[in-house]
């Protein structure tokens, strides 16, 4: 199967199992119950672009009400179609005042539309209910990282993982000329199947227990494939392939540098080739105050913790998280489950993802949140026939959800159509978005569930305190100076991976004066990493004039400069104080 067709099946139409139109000899489907369905299927109710900007403006206005100045919107990049990619800065607005910060990102694609709702809900709750937290912690939030994909998905009612880059997927000199097309006129892109004619390779069978399901033949059980399966579309370019040159593009979560999947059709021509990805990368590079990050979307590292300690062929690069950081990430996963009560979540391949780039290239404590999975189907009504056992339990479970929770709205019954190239085909299957994205009502519920975790993770920060500088005379103008630096916070100053990559600036202690007067100890000391609750002790032997004092400064990426003065006993000394956060 062509690479783009595989990609389309895996992402755009990940919502679709496949079956045949009902015939008289088919076993009856489970009875459709009149239930309180959780609202219209996605993308109904979702918004993008200008509507998202309006919601961000409302958050800023609320945060800045009553004479406060706690929020602003900045443009950090422009999409390929010219749409602004915006970040909202929530908390202290004086950029010269250094504080720890958390990064929130959503809207990386047009498949998981709920991620933007999760970011916006978190922002609303933080500005409304966590005023004290915002005095000591900044929040940077990007609600729509890939606005073009989100807008296309909503407007076309078809999931789209990629941005608007034009790509000649099938290398025929034409761009995006053979995208999926609506054959039966129902306004949706679903699937087509047909009995494989002579000379073609059949791959699937119609399930004997439930004819709505078309599944791969189980050759180990002697099944013989009878059907071909396609994404709904036409062979516009006459190359014998259907829907293989779809619109776009590059998936942003395959475009980042860590484990960049260079041969994937949706990875882009090179790492961070896309303006959306580069805009995020530059923003992160320019904000070394970021200590933690949550990327909402198709990935999950909290419910399904990636426990692997494997490294790549160099034996240096972790496939997911560095083993030495696992305890920290496990603690975050536990916090997530306790905060949200979510025990199941979908996920996706992390290769080339933003979350792994943040964690392994930037040294930020970064996690991925999805939280969405197949809903539970209500029990069958009393007296209803028991559900039949099919050859594909997962597809049958989704059918049960459609039948019992959505009143059958999740599945488009197969109908016979005359295809201009294939002849007689059946068109139908699960509706786009049904399996990949919650309804807007479900997304709002999910956002309420994940917001407490955002607030609790924001409370996990390093906090540097510096003791008073103690001066002890030795003799002949020589003094000893002692100082202690402590991390009284709940997070290390950087991850162990951050210490290795050295992308997060270290904490720097500097003895002010002529370096040649520092006779023992280093005039400049660096703390690459300080665990939560840990302390470092420092001593210097310094040559001073009679009665003179010595100043030591402590500088870090997420606290204002701290100055301590070591003075003779007759002079006033400053007590140790906590670093501004």
Each language-model region and where it sits:
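Bacterial N-terminal signal peptides
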Residues: 8-17
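Short glycine- and acidic-rich boundary segments immediately preceding or forming the N-terminal edge
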Residues: 28-84, 445
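Metallocarboxypeptidase
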Residues: 72, 84, 140-142, 248-474, ...
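Active-site/substrate-binding loop(s) of hydrolase catalytic cores
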Residues: 98-99, 113-117, 121-321
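Short amphipathic, basic-aromatic surface patches that mediate peripheral association
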Residues: 485-499
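Intrinsically disordered, low-complexity Pro/Gly/Ser/Thr-rich segments with frequent PxxP/GP/PP motifs
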Residues: 517-545
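Short, aromatic- and glycine-rich surface loops/edge beta-strands on solvent-exposed regions
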Residues: 548-557
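Edge beta-strands of extracellular beta-sandwich domains
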Residues: 559-572
């Amino acid at each position: 199967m062509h690479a783009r067709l595989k990609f389309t099946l895996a992402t755009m139409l990940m919502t679709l199992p496949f079956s045949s139109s009902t015939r008289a000899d088919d076993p009856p489907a489970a009875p459709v119950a009149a239930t309180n369905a959780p609202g219209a299927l996605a993308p109904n109710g979702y918004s993008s672009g200008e509507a998202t900007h309006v919601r961000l403006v409302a958050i800023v206005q609320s945060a800045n009400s009553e004479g406060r100045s706690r929020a602003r919107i900045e443009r950090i990049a422009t999409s390929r179609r010219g749409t602004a990619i915006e970040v909202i800065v929530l908390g202290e607005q004086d950029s010269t005042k250094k504080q720890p910060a958390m990064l929130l990102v959503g809207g990386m694609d047009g498949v998981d539309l709920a991620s933007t709702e999760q970011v916006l809900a978190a922002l609303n709750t933080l500005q409304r209910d966590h005023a004290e937290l915002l005095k000591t912690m900044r929040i940077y939030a990007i609600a729509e990282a890939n606005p073009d994909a989100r807008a296309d998905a909503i407007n076309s009612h078809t999931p789209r993982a990629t941005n608007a880059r034009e790509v000649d997927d099938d290398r025929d000199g034409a761009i995006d000329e053979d995208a999926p097309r609506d054959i039966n006129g129902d306004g949706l892109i679903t699937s087509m199947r047909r009995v494989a004619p002579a000379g073609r390779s059949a791959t699937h069978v119609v399930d004997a227990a439930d004819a709505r399901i078309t599944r791969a033949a189980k050759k180990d059980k002697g099944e013989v494939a009878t059907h071909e399966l396609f994404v709904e579309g036409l062979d516009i370019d006459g190359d014998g392939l259907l829907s293989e040159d779809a619109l776009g593009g590059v998936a942003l979560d395959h475009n980042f540098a860590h484990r960049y999947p260079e041969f994937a059709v949706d990875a882009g021509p090179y790492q961070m080739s896309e303006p959306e990805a580069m805009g995020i990368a530059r923003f992160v590079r320019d904000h070394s105050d970021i200590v933690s990050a949550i990327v909402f979307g198709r990935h999950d590292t909290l419910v399904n913790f990636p426990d692997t300690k494997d490294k790549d062929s160099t034996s240096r690069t972790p496939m997911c998280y560095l083993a030495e950081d696992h305890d920290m990430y496990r603690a975050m996963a536990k916090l997530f489950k306790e905060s949200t009560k979510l025990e199941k979540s979908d996920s996706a391949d992390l290769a080339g993802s933003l979350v792994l780039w943040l964690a392994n290239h930037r040294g930020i404590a970064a996690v991925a949140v999805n939280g969405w999975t197949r809903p539970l189907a209500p029990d069958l009504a009393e007296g209803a026939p028991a559900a039949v056992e099919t050859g594909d339990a997962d597809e049958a479970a989704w059918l049960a959800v459609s039948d019992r929770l959505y009143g059958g709205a999740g599945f488009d019954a197969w109908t016979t159509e005359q295809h201009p190239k294939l002849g007689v085909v059946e068109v139908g299957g699960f509706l786009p978005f049904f399996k990949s994205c919650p309804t807007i009502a479900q997304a709002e519920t999910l956002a309420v569930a994940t917001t407490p975790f955002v607030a609790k993770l924001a409370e996990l920060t390093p906090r540097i305190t510096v003791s008073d500088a103690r001066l002890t005379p030795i003799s002949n103008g020589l003094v000893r100076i002692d100082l202690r630096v402590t991390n009284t916070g709940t997070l290390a100053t950087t991850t162990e991976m951050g210490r290795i990559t050295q992308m997060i600036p270290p904490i720097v202690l500097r003895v002010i004066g002529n370096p040649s007067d520092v006779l023992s100890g280093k005039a400049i000391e660096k703390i690459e990493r300080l665990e939560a609750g840990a302390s470092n002790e420092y001593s210097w032997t310094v040559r001073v004039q009679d009665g003179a004092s010595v100043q030591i400064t402590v500088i870090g990426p997420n606290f204002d400069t701290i100055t301590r003065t070591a003075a003779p006993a007759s002079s006033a000394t400053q007590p140790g104080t906590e670093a501004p956060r």
